[in-house]
């Protein structure tokens, strides 16, 4: 309630202002600096900011994988990157799509419900032209796909879905499958118009053609795994899978590396003068080696086994006798499995 000043209080206030003892600024009401956020009850937010960031990270991986796979398939420069990740109603998404367009309805097994992958017409026709042997220039007319073009796009989308599965691995073992391809957005009603969805918009460039791909996923589809869409869960999963994946790749690469295997008769120390004086026919006496002693078999400059020299057919060979230092039993059995009779 507003306070009413008496005449004496008014006179005192006017006197203070005229004498400079009180500032006019002090009499002004203090403005409210609190930030007010608008909230639309017709479209409540279903995803937190952290969950949206996690979805963005997941689909950045998807964008990189798709860039690589499409570039290899089309033999052309393809670039895909995440432009935005938003939440909106399904009706708003449908209204934003041109007609005709390429809409792939995708089952998200084991999650319930479907998702939609929408490919801009300019990108669709650029891909088709490239696969048909052209330069990748998109058609300038808006039309539906022919049966052959539709079949070609099915193959491309199936390949893209493999990237979706890979990018979701940290959260769930997703097995997305292509249901059907629609060209009219009104025929792709996967959820009620008012249902909230997350829309991942991907800027796509095929050759010189630029356009968009949109991946639309309903909230009811993601809801069972919503707790896993956290930064902590995501990064811990990435570290675990990365370690396992990289160890497997490292093991595969190392298994194909060529190693030097040397059977050493013996060794001794010589002066530089003696080495420079060596001639063909000279005999070098190995003081610490006797006739019949086993050779030392070194692998990658590390002494691993004792072996016996001999021949197999017309080839010089060495038979492994025993290990020198710690080598796994599996490696030893593999090296000594194919023993053949050796002749001195």
UniProtKB/Swiss-Prot annotation:
Belongs to the FliM family. One of its GO terms (molecular function) is cytoskeletal motor activity. PANTHER family: FLAGELLAR MOTOR SWITCH PROTEIN FLIM, YOP PROTEINS TRANSLOCATION PROTEIN Q. FliM is one of three proteins (FliG, FliN, FliM) that forms the rotor-mounted switch complex (C ring), located at the base of the basal body. This complex interacts with the CheY and CheZ chemotaxis proteins, in addition to contacting components of the motor that determine the direction of flagellar rotation. The keyword Transcription regulation does not apply. This is Flagellar motor switch protein FliM. Pfam families: FliM, FliMN_C. It is a peripheral membrane protein. GO terms for cellular component: bacterial-type flagellum basal body; plasma membrane. One of its GO terms (biological process) is positive chemotaxis. SUPFAM superfamilies: CheC-like, Surface presentation of antigens (SPOA). Keywords: Bacterial flagellum, Cell inner membrane, Cell membrane, Chemotaxis, Flagellar rotation, Membrane. The lineage of its organism: Bacteria, Pseudomonadati, Spirochaetota, Spirochaetia, Spirochaetales. The keyword Amino-acid biosynthesis does not apply. It comes from the Bacteria. It is found in: Cell inner membrane; Bacterial flagellum basal body. Its main location: membrane.
């Amino acid at each position: 309630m507003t306070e009413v000043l008496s005449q004496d209080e008014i006179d005192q206030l006017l006197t203070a202002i005229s004498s400079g003892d009180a500032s006019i600024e002090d009499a002004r009401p203090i403005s409210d600096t609190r930030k007010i956020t608008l909230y639309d009850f017709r479209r409540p937010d279903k995803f937190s900011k952290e969950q949206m960031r996690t979805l963005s990270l997941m689909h950045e991986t998807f964008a990189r994988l798709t860039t690589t796979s499409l570039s290899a398939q089309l033999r052309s420069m393809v670039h895909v990157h995440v432009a935005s990740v938003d939440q909106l109603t399904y009706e708003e998404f449908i209204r934003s799509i041109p007609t005709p367009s390429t809409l792939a309805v995708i089952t998200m097994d084991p999650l319930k419900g479907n998702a939609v992958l929408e490919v801009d017409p300019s990108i669709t026709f650029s891909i088709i032209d490239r696969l048909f042997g052209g330069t990748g220039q998109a058609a300038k007319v808006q039309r539906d796909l022919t049966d052959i073009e539709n079949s070609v796009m099915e193959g491309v989308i199936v390949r893209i879905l493999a990237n979706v599965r890979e990018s979701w691995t940290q959260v769930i073992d997703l097995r997305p499958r292509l249901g059907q391809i629609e060209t009219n957005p009104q025929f792709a009603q996967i959820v009620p118009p008012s249902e909230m969805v997350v829309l991942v918009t991907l800027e796509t460039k095929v050759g010189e053609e630029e356009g968009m791909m949109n991946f639309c996923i309903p909230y009811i589809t993601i809801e069972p795994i919503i707790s896993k869409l956290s930064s902590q869960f995501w990064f811990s999963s990435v570290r675990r899978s990365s370690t396992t994946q990289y160890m497997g790749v490292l093991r595969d690469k190392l298994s194909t590396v060529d190693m030097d295997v040397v059977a050493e008769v013996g060794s001794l120390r010589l002066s530089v003068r003696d080495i420079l004086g060596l001639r063909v026919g000279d005999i070098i006496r190995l003081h610490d080696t006797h006739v019949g002693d086993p050779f030392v078999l070194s692998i990658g400059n590390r002494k691993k086994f004792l072996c016996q020299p001999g021949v197999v057919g017309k080839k010089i060979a060495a038979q492994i006798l025993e290990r020198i230092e710690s080598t796994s039993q599996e490696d030893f059995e593999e090296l000594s499995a194919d023993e053949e009779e050796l002749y001195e």
